[in-house]
Each structure stands twice: as structure tokens, then as C-alpha cells.
């Protein structure tokens, strides 16, 4: 009798239950649950702000695809990342893949940090993105209300800007427009709203 074959990492990733995101980073399967509402809000707001000027060309140069949570295969079925947002210049990726696997390295990636993903995003994914030559990386921390912008230079991520609270963001590769950072942050819950009812 033949021993049962162990599933590949990618087969394990595909078998994850709904609501769990999986990535294969440096040969290990990493999982995390769906994010909180505040975290999702930041990604939605950033995508909305970028789509008109950079995808549609309304008030900006156009020429980009900006996509939420694409499954990026740096190495098909072996090195798989799912960033919160990613962008490609259309001349580099004129068409979408026929399945879920994006195999063209993005020009830009944005990770939205949460307590469960911040360490992985900074310590595993940023070096991986640099290795595969993602030219621009943004890290947004909803809890700290910050945005950090990085550019790849000679294989190293160099910080090009740090923004907080109500700053206006003008950062590569989307420096053609100024983004109002304040609209990304959800309203603060009043203290009384968290108090138990008597």
C-alpha cells in the first residue's frame, strides 16, 4: 500500500476555510483571519482615492491597475503573497491573468498593519518584496494613524516619507496627486460607547 501523499503547500493554501487568508512566504504557510472593520475601511478608502486618478485618469495620469488583495505568485504556487493592495503600470501588465494567480511583479504594494500581521509584514514580506523587486511599498498603521512610504534602491527599501493623522500624502509612485490621510481613519469610538449598560 502506498503512503498517502502530503498535500503541497499550495494545496494546503487552497484548502483553507473561507474567511482565512493564506500566503506562502519563504517556504512556510502563513494564515490570518479576515481583518477588523477599521482595517478594511483603510484599504477601501485608499483604493477609492487611487482608482479615479490612476486607473481611470480622472484628475490624474491614469495608466495603472490598483487591486485589492491579489494573489501574487512571485514563483508559481511556491512563493505566494496576498498584499492588501497592489498596483501595476498597465504597460507592464496590460491584461489580467485568466485565473487568480498574478505572476507579474507589482510596481507598488500596500500593507495595512494589524496587531496580528505587523511583524510578518515588516520582517518577512518587506524583504521578500525587495528581493522580487517591488519598486514601491507603503505601510499603513490604522492604530497609529500613520503611512510610511518606501522606494527600492539597490535591493534595499529606503523610506521616502512618513505621514500621520491629517497630513497630505504626496509619495511615489502616486505623487501626481495629494491624498488626504485623515479620511482613511475611522471615527474614534467615544468612551461611553464601550461602557457596559447598567
Where does each model-flagged region fall?
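Gly/Pro/Ser/Thr-rich low-complexity, intrinsically disordered segments predominantly at protein N-termini
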Residues: 1-198
Amino acid at each position: 500500500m502506498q503512503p498517502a501523499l502530503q498535500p503541497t503547500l499550495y494545496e494546503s493554501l487552497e484548502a483553507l476555510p473561507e474567511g482565512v487568508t493564506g500566503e506562502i512566504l519563504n517556504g512556510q504557510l502563513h494564515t490570518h483571519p479576515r481583518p477588523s472593520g477599521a482595517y478594511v475601511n483603510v484599504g477601501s478608502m485608499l483604493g477609492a482615492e487611487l482608482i479615479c486618478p490612476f486607473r481611470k485618469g480622472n484628475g490624474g495620469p491614469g495608466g495603472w491597475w490598483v487591486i485589492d488583495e491579489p494573489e501574487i505568485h512571485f514563483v508559481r504556487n511556491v512563493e505566494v503573497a496576498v498584499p492588501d493592495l497592489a498596483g501595476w503600470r498597465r504597460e507592464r501588465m496590460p491584461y489580467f491573468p485568466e485565473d487568480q494567480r498574478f505572476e507579474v511583479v507589482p510596481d507598488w504594494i500596500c500593507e495595512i498593519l494589524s496587531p496580528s500581521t505587523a511583524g510578518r509584514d515588516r520582517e518577512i514580506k518587506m524583504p521578500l518584496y525587495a528581493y522580487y523587486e517591488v519598486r514601491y511599498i507603503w505601510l499603513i498603521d490604522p492604530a497609529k494613524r500613520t503611512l510610511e512610504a518606501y522606494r527600492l534602491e539597490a535591493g534595499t527599501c529606503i523610506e521616502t516619507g512618513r505621514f500621520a493623522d491629517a497630513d497630505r500624502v504626496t509619495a511615489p509612485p502616486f505623487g501626481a496627486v495629494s491624498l488626504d490621510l485623515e479620511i482613511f481613519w475611522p471615527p474614534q469610538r467615544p468612551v461611553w460607547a464601550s461602557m457596559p449598560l447598567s
